[in-house]
Swiss-Prot record:
<feature type="topological domain" description="Cytoplasmic">
    <location>
        <begin position="296"/>
        <end position="369"/>
    </location>
</feature>
<feature type="transmembrane region" description="Helical; Name=3">
    <location>
        <begin position="119"/>
        <end position="139"/>
    </location>
</feature>
<keyword id="KW-0807">Transducer</keyword>
<feature type="transmembrane region" description="Helical; Name=4">
    <location>
        <begin position="149"/>
        <end position="169"/>
    </location>
</feature>
<feature type="topological domain" description="Cytoplasmic">
    <location>
        <begin position="140"/>
        <end position="148"/>
    </location>
</feature>
<dbReference type="GO" id="GO:0007606">
    <property type="term" value="P:sensory perception of chemical stimulus"/>
</dbReference>
<keyword id="KW-0812">Transmembrane</keyword>
<feature type="transmembrane region" description="Helical; Name=1">
    <location>
        <begin position="21"/>
        <end position="41"/>
    </location>
</feature>
<keyword id="KW-1133">Transmembrane helix</keyword>
<feature type="transmembrane region" description="Helical; Name=2">
    <location>
        <begin position="56"/>
        <end position="76"/>
    </location>
</feature>
<keyword id="KW-0297">G-protein coupled receptor</keyword>
<feature type="topological domain" description="Extracellular">
    <location>
        <begin position="1"/>
        <end position="20"/>
    </location>
</feature>
<feature type="transmembrane region" description="Helical; Name=5">
    <location>
        <begin position="179"/>
        <end position="199"/>
    </location>
</feature>
<feature type="topological domain" description="Cytoplasmic">
    <location>
        <begin position="200"/>
        <end position="234"/>
    </location>
</feature>
<feature type="topological domain" description="Extracellular">
    <location>
        <begin position="170"/>
        <end position="178"/>
    </location>
</feature>
<comment type="similarity">
    <text>Belongs to the nematode receptor-like protein sre family.</text>
</comment>
<keyword id="KW-0472">Membrane</keyword>
């Protein structure tokens, strides 16, 4: 059974280094618990399409629970929760409904969820691509008719397939680890290919709207939706590229940490790969978060309006984007009215002065004549 767990024993030559990395990972995960909880809390205020919010929210919720699962496994690895190798060897020979050791059941559930989440991060790019594909097809009605069934079908299908795939992975059925990782990477590459097609399709439609006479099929609202769809796809594209790069790198660590030959002959290397894999996922989530928030100026300005996001990102990027992180002073209605009419009065005075100068100049020319 391929449980995502490698205990750090007292005999490990790199024990101090491995424990240091795990403690750094736990600190980062605790920080991300609060960070992503704040994002989830504010998700209802984001002005995106319902289906897009559900798919993104589904991924964020899944990662939030994955953080809890990983911290639990880390407690087993550093010895905070005690589970000896003999108990694990006995329990792995049984079927899930015959497990009796509560600690092993907790470890198995957390490990199953971790692999399910790995499947999710490989397939979420495909979910976004399919959601944007349907937004392109039904662009004329996608905002007025929300098509909520789209997000329900996508997320429920992904959940069922992910849990089923995780169980097959743990019991080493059908495919080995390398094939499962290759399958996940294929999802990424298919989604990139689909994104390129959809991006060019939206771009050509917008160009067509601009070069031909406005007809019933290309109304102003339809062109606006096409343009918004194009902007959202261009924004998500940056995140997809980062996700694909990280998935490719982490797939190598996952294969190495579950390889039987390496487990027997190079156990220290396997533990290092396992630690790098878990720390890499924590860093990966943080990088994707920063890329999604800050990669595009339009969306950077939009997201930084929300205080939790601004608080979490300012220590890292406040000096890089100083103008975007400035908190604009909000005036009261009476103050805004006074400022508006003061500007209007100033413009009116300037216009009168310019007009008087023109009249004087005309009179001078008249008397010269």
């Amino acid at each position: 059974m391929l449980i995502q767990y490698h205990k750090i024993s007292n005999n490990d030559p790199n024990r101090i280094q491995l424990l240091s990395m795990i403690f750094c990972e736990i600190i980062l995960l605790i920080f991300e618990l609060f960070e992503f909880a704040a994002i989830i809390f504010n998700m209802s205020r984001y002005q995106f399409h319902f289906n897009l919010k559900v798919v993104v929210g589904y991924a964020i919720f899944a990662y939030w629970f994955d953080i809890i699962a990983r911290i639990t496994i880390a407690f087993f690895e550093i010895g905070l929760f005690n589970l000896d190798d003999q108990t694990i060897a006995v329990e792995t020979e049984k079927l899930p409904w015959n497990y009796k050791n509560m600690f092993f059941m907790l470890l198995f559930c957390c490990s199953t969820y971790r692999v399910y989440f790995m499947f999710l991060i490989c397939s979420v790019t495909l979910l976004l691509a399919v959601e944007r594909f349907l937004a392109t097809i039904w662009v004329s009605t996608y905002e007025s008719v929300q098509h909520k069934w789209v997000s329900i079908v996508l997320t429920s299908t992904n959940s069922i397939a992910g849990i089923f795939g995780s169980l097959l992975f743990h019991y080493e059925l059908i495919f080995d680890t390398a094939v499962w990782c290759s399958l996940g990477l294929c999802f990424n590459f298919v989604s990139i290919f689909l994104y390129v097609i959809l991006f060019n399709s939206n771009k050509s439609k917008i160009e067509l709207c601009q070069t031909r006479e406005i007809t019933q099929s290309y109304t102003l609202s339809l062109r606006f939706q096409l343009n918004e769809n194009l902007k959202i796809m261009n924004w998500i594209k940056n995140s997809i590229l980062v996700v694909t790069c990280f998935n490719t790198l982490l797939a190598g660590f996952l294969i190495a940490s579950n390889n039987e030959y390496l487990k027997n002959d190079y156990p220290v290397l396997v533990k290092c790969c396992h630690t790098f894999l878990n720390l890499g996922i924590a860093i990966y989530a943080q990088v994707v978060f920063f890329v999604a928030i800050l990669a595009d100026r339009h969306f950077r300005t939009y997201f930084l309006r929300f205080k939790p996001i601004r608080v979490f990102t300012k220590p890292f990027f406040g000096r890089i984007f100083p103008e975007d992180f400035k908190i604009k002073k909000i005036l009261s209605t009476s103050d805004e009215t006074n400022v508006y009419f003061s500007k209007l009065s100033l413009q009116w005075d300037e216009q009168i002065i310019r007009s008087s100068h023109v009249v004087v100049a005309k009179k001078k020319r008249f008397w010269r004549v």
